[in-house]
């Protein structure tokens, strides 16, 4: 897992340097100039970037749950690597423990947030990586994105039935008012909890660790089980890796 962190950090700096070189090359070209050194450095940076991307792919393919998450639309080698490298699956003995560590847990009815002088019970970096992954899942428009849209619709209807006014702006300081952004984040969190429960299940299952039942959710008053396999789609191609 440490290798993923090392390669990811190296890749970040190489990509940053490559972009700077490309910008320099573009600037020179606009002024009808060339700099052999810039072009040579750019070529070497691009080669190193390709090498590091290949290394990330090799590391991710060794993950116990790879056969499952490699078939999830929206999951790429980098975004999933940044998530699982921060998780100690042996310590996460239950799904709820993983949820709390990755996303924070409700305290007095509100999601835990960082407050000055107070300890937090989640990994801030992991939480950030999870939210980035959530956006990737939604953009990919796969089965997790479908679940997200279903949850967004359900939450919206529930709020309307409870007498809430849904607005586009800030809801701060207003009673019986909730913003569209708040509902969106609630739906994304639901989707992330489902994904993390599936990752937890397939990962621990592959390692022979004790597991519990899959994540349960309520739809129309009926209890349904969504299995990790139900969310799998066609094998990814190199294009969407």
PLM segments and residue spans:
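Phosphate- and other anionic-substrate recognition elements at nucleic-acid/protein interfaces
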Residues: 1-30
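Acidic, low-complexity intrinsically disordered tails
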Residues: 232-241
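Amphipathic alpha-helical core segments of compact helical bundles
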Residues: 80, 127, 131, 135, ...
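Non-transmembrane, amphipathic alpha-helical segments
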Residues: 3-6, 10, 37, 180, ...
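Generic recognition of stable, solvent-exposed alpha-helical segments in well-folded globular domains
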Residues: 9, 16, 75-78, 93, ...
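Basic, amphipathic alpha-helical segments enriched in Lys/Arg and hydrophobic/aromatic residues
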Residues: 169, 179-216, 220-231
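Helix-hairpin-helix/helix-loop-helix acidic hairpins
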Residues: 22-78
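Phosphate-backbone recognition surface of nucleic-acid-processing proteins
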Residues: 68, 83-185, 189
